[in-house]
């Protein structure tokens, strides 16, 4: 198959593209190479993808509609996987315009592109942050998600709403999948796991917010990629509406549109996560206990029922196994070879 994937120099986009290329598919990757974090890491990811003749890269911003058109002409995609975004809850407090530009204007450009070329399936990356401070657990796709705690979450919810309207108007089958704290090799340096491991190795304290009592539904990257690939083969339609006894389906009554959680439903308390990291690294961390930051939520906890009903799969890699794999990657790429990154 032929895919157009945005954000292929990013953590998740890199892994999704690599999986599809390794399976023999053709992928055009679109990425703006923004300096939100070390661009060298993004360049290294793209360099790996570019070893294959099944990958072509277009470097441009999502706000550049003409560049998106060029990428689509090159890809002739059957499936579009829109992963590029301005990520990060805390950064949205400092630079809100970046979120409006990438997550609203950029996503609107993607919807306009899908309207023009009518792919078999449009897939959009969303986030568990949409659930805000939801007290009902686990978080199900049909739960209220209209009280975002950050601009980042608000832009992602807005993207979902725009996508539903386009799916209704132009009949492009569209799936919005909500991530839950994704981690693993080649992960972002601003994420907790990378920061914790790097700090421990370099003798710096780690900041533990919420006194360590917050919990997160950590999702290992390979599990997420498997979820996305399987969902790509299930474009929303009445033919695959899920029976109520299996899960509450979010398939719209008015459009070929569906929202799906991609978490495994196994939340871990932050202090337990820290202890797991310490064990994998082989030394204790220096703990700097802090209150919750503005915009943080006390917990995330996915219901994987709909994902499993649609694909026969739910994330299962344990935090212990996933953290160990990340530490092994970090040791090979940072601890032993700092000058290469």
Curated annotation (Swiss-Prot):
Superkingdom of origin organism: Bacteria
Pfam family, one: Epimerase
Gene Ontology MF term list: UDP-glucuronate 4-epimerase activity
Disruption phenotype: Mutation affects lipopolysaccharide (LPS) production.
EC assignment: 5.1.3.6
Keyword annotations of the record: Isomerase, NAD
Catalysed reactions listed for this entry: UDP-alpha-D-glucuronate = UDP-alpha-D-galacturonate
UniProt-listed SUPFAM superfamilies: NAD(P)-binding Rossmann-fold domains
Keyword Isomerase included in the entry's annotation: yes
Active site: 152 (proton acceptor)
Cofactor: NAD(+)
InterPro entries linked: Epimerase_deHydtase, NAD(P)-bd_dom_sf
Stated family: Belongs to the NAD(P)-dependent epimerase/dehydratase family.
UniProt-listed PANTHER family: EPIMERASE-RELATED
The protein, known as: Probable UDP-glucuronate 4-epimerase
Organism: Rhizobium meliloti (strain 1021)
Gene: lspL
């Amino acid at each position: 198959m032929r895919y157009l994937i945005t954000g292929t120099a990013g953590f998740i986009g890199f892994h999704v593209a690599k999986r599809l290329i390794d399976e023999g598919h053709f992928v055009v990757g679109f990425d703006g190479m923004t300096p939100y974090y070390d661009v060298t890491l993004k360049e290294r990811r793209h360099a790996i993808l570019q070893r294959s003749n099944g990958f072509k890269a277009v470097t441009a911003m999502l706000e550049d509609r003409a560049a998106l058109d060029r990428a689509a002409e090159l890809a002739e995609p059957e499936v579009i996987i829109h992963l590029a975004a301005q990520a990060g809850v805390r950064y949205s407090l400092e630079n809100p315009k970046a979120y409006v530009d990438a997550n609203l204007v950029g996503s609107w450009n993607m919807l306009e592109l899908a309207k023009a070329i009518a792919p078999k399936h449009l897939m959009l990356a969303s986030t568990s942050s949409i659930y805000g401070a939801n007290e009902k657990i686990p978080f199900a796709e049909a739960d209220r998600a209209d009280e975002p705690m950050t601009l980042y979450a608000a832009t992602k919810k807005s993207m979902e709403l725009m996508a539903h309207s386009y799916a209704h108007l132009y009949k492009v089958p569209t799936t919005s999948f909500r991530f839950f704290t994704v981690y693993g090799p080649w992960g972002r340096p601003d994420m907790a796991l990378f920061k914790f491991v790097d700090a421990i190795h370099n003798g710096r304290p780690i900041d533990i917010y919420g006194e360590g009592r917050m919990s997160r539904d950590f999702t290992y990257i390979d599990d997420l990629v498997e979820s996305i690939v399987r969902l790509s083969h299930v474009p929303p339609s009445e033919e695959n509406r899920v029976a109520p006894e299996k899960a509450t389906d979010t398939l719209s009554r008015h459009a070929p549109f569906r929202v799906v959680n991609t978490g495994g439903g196994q939340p871990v308390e932050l202090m337990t996560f820290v202890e797991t990291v310490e064990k994998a690294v082989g030394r204790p961390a220096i703990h700097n206990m802090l209150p919750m930051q503005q915009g943080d939520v006390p917990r995330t906890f996915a219901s994987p029922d709909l994902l499993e009903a649609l694909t026969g799969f739910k994330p299962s890699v344990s935090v212990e196994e996933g953290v160990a794999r990340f530490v092994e990657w970090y040791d090979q790429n940072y601890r032993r070879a700092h000058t290469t990154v």
